Amino acid sequence: MEPGMLGPHNLPHHEPISFGIDQILSGPETPGGGLGLGRGGQGHGENGAFSGGYHGASGYGPAGSLAPLPGSSGVGPGGVIRVPAHRPLPVPPPAGGAPAVPGPSGLGGAGGLAGLTFPWMDSGRRFAKDRLTAALSPFSGTRRIGHPYQNRTPPKRKKPRTSFSRSQVLELERRFLRQKYLASAERAALAKALRMTDAQVKTWFQNRRTKWRRQTAEEREAERHRAGRLLLHLQQDALPRPLRPPLPPDPLCLHNSSLFALQNLQPWAEDNKVASVSGLASVV
């Protein structure tokens, strides 16, 4: 038979050493709280060593003792001692008084993990619950039943616009034409005379000044456009008039090149020069 086909019963037996963990923990000074012997009273071998795996955690004794109870597994395959990273809390016995069924030994079984409770598990559950509560808090308020648009918060109602009488508006306009800004005493006196509040007079003057500035800016812009159009018209009038149209060619000049050239130069001559030249010709 090949060495790789050997079963678990054909594995070589490891001889115990005198300074191992089993000998130190199983001394006479810890009769009740130390690490006890394994199943069948064996202190060495596969069932005598302490196992720290999760499946051996259900055998922990009361008051934080590390001694495994009967039914807990020992050393894993190969004689390796496993120490748990966290000490699990003791599991209370079942309510019916039935004996707890031990899970399968070794790390491959999952029966011992069913009832284990670690401190970090409680904190994780508490953290997840807090996060869920915080996430659902905006939706936990009371919502009105109906159309989705009806569930929205109704908008604030606007304050109705104050209307003044014709006599009040005329007096305010007359005062605004004389004085654009009012002092506190003048505003109070005008409000008392018109049977208005100080805030109403102040608001009316503010709105009227805004309207006055807008009208003034529009008037200035219109004047600027009118001035631009007037300047353009004056520039067009200041430009020289176009030249006279050329005279029809004389049939006599068409047969003489010199007379034809002289006739072509005649439109560029000024009226006074033409008159002087004609006068000189008549004198001669």
Swiss-Prot record:
The keyword ATP-binding does not apply. Residues 157-216 bind DNA. Its main location: nucleus. Residues 30-50 have a biased composition (Gly residues). It holds the Pfam family Homeodomain. It is found in: Nucleus. GO terms for biological process: animal organ development; enteric nervous system development; mesoderm formation; negative regulation of dendrite morphogenesis; positive regulation of transcription by RNA polymerase II; regulation of transcription by RNA polymerase II. Residues 87-96 have a biased composition (Pro residues). Keywords: Activator, Developmental protein, DNA-binding, Homeobox, Nucleus, Transcription, Transcription regulation. SMART domains: HOX. It comes from the Eukaryota. Residues 1-50, 78-106, 139-166 are annotated as: Disordered. Transcription activator that binds DNA elements with the consensus sequence 5'-CGGTAATTGG-3'. Binds DNA via its homeobox. Required for normal cell death of enteric neurons in the gastrointestinal tract. Required for normal development of the enteric nervous system, and for proper development of normal motility of the gastrointestinal tract. This is T-cell leukemia homeobox protein 2. It comes from Homo sapiens (Human). The lineage of its organism: Eukaryota, Metazoa, Chordata, Craniata, Vertebrata.
